[in-house]
Curated annotation (Swiss-Prot):
One of its GO terms (molecular function) is lipid binding. This is Sphingosine kinase 1. Substrate binds at S79, G80, D81, G82, D178. ATP binds at residues 22-24, 54-58, 86, 111-113, 185, 191, 340-342. The gene is Sphk1. Interacts with ACY1. Binds to calmodulin. Interacts with SPHKAP. Interacts with CIB1, the interaction occurs in a calcium-dependent manner. Interacts with TRAF2. Interacts with EEF1A1; the interaction enhances SPHK1 kinase activity. It comes from the Eukaryota. PANTHER family: SPHINGOSINE KINASE (PTHR12358), SPHINGOSINE KINASE 1 (PTHR12358:SF47). Its cofactor is Mg(2+). It is a peripheral membrane protein. The modification Phosphoserine is found at S225.
Amino acid sequence: MEPVECPRGLLPRPCRVLVLLNPQGGKGKALQLFQSRVQPFLEEAEITFKLILTERKNHARELVCAEELGHWDALAVMSGDGLMHEVVNGLMERPDWETAIQKPLCSLPGGSGNALAASVNHYAGYEQVTNEDLLINCTLLLCRRRLSPMNLLSLHTASGLRLYSVLSLSWGFVADVDLESEKYRRLGEIRFTVGTFFRLASLRIYQGQLAYLPVGTVASKRPASTLVQKGPVDTHLVPLEEPVPSHWTVVPEQDFVLVLVLLHTHLSSELFAAPMGRCEAGVMHLFYVRAGVSRAALLRLFLAMQKGKHMELDCPYLVHVPVVAFRLEPRSQRGVFSVDGELMVCEAVQGQVHPNYLWMVCGSRDAPSGRDSRRGPPPEEP
């Protein structure tokens, strides 16, 4: 099969797409929804596709590691955010990761956590919607073929793991809700509402050290020992055994209800977590809630977050900072981390954002402005 060219910022017409679908995601109806809601639009828009159903955890990761990507103009992922996490990490594990990660991606919501799709929906100028309405909007964006670059978060853990996030890392309340609501996944995204009320009933406090590199901070010199591994070089990070560089900000408080690092606007299709808008290139949102917040105040925050109004409450315990890197060192192994909705062992972790590092189907062809916007258009196939 001959590869095709990808014009700047647009998928070609006709277009070939590899669709990875988790039939067990969300309410377990993703396949039926694809056949009834997505497929007719694709056929009309001259988008041919191959559909692969994932069979187990990390199946999508294995598939994209081995796939001949030149056969496809884009990869579409129909599930929750976790399957996109698998795909991106699979692409970054390939020997040709530098070109593989530029293969355009499309998020089709079919899971119980659809924050990435909700964010793309927001960037396209659509109203906040859920379920089949959100799926149809994202399908229409694929049919329109427009691409936009997105930031990528590189993470390192104390045990030596390196992984990548396309959406978020959370610790504390949000991660607990992710974990404990898993048993309600057949309810769809309402599982998070149920989980929130259960967790509010028994609010936990987590102890740890949080540090970050704010946007606009200029170092007198680059750290002497930056992390160098396969993949993009994390120039702002030093090994976890070393103290953070002196130009970083260390949060004096060490008791938290939650810490959230977020690359996009939504935490779910019904949680507009970052109403300040799309991150600039090379920037991510850091939110944390300090211990001392009451259950009632925390509930008000999450209820207001449904409409993006939580920052207007001026809660003294809620802090938001735009950052380019962070480090979080839990004092114990109690609890978990959630990375793009996928659970990770609780241990020291740090990360930095890489600007405009991957391409996604989106409603706007404009790249996020700001820091070091280096990525060009997706490469044309030879």
